[in-house]
Amino acid sequence: MKYLIILAIFFNLSYETTNYFEEAGEYYRIDPKILYCIAKKESKFNPNAISRNSNGSVDIGVMQINSVHLKELKKYGFQKEHLFNPKINIYAGAWLLKRCFNKHGVSEDGITCYNGRIENNTYGYEVLKELKLVYEKEK
C-alpha cells in the first residue's frame, strides 16, 4: 500500500483512485499492483483516455476497456459513459483480467489475454517487467 501511495503522488493520482486498485484486487483476488501496472501501460492513469483501434473498436478509460465488452457490461447496467468513472473502469478491468486468469492461469499469457490476442504479443511480458520494478522499489 505504501508503494501505491508514493506512485499516486508521483503520477498525481488521488488516494481514492489508488484505493480502487486495492479494492478491485481484493474483490477479484488479483494482486492490485498488476492492475496498477496495466493502468499505467494502458492509459498512464488517464480516466478520460480514448484509443481508437484499427478494427473500429474503442478503448475507454484508465484500464482501456475495449468497446467489444459493452454489450456484456450492459447486462449489468453499465453504459459506455460509466467507464469514464475510474472506480467502475478499474473494477471492469479487474473483472476482465480475472476472466483471463481463469482461462490462462495467473501467468504472462493471462495478462496478455487482457490485451486481446496472445500470439506474437509481448504485452504480458511488458506488464510483468513493470511489476518487477514495482516490487524492487518496495524493498
Label the model's feature ranges.
Residues S14-K139:
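Catalytic glycan-binding domains that act on GlcNAc-containing polysaccharides
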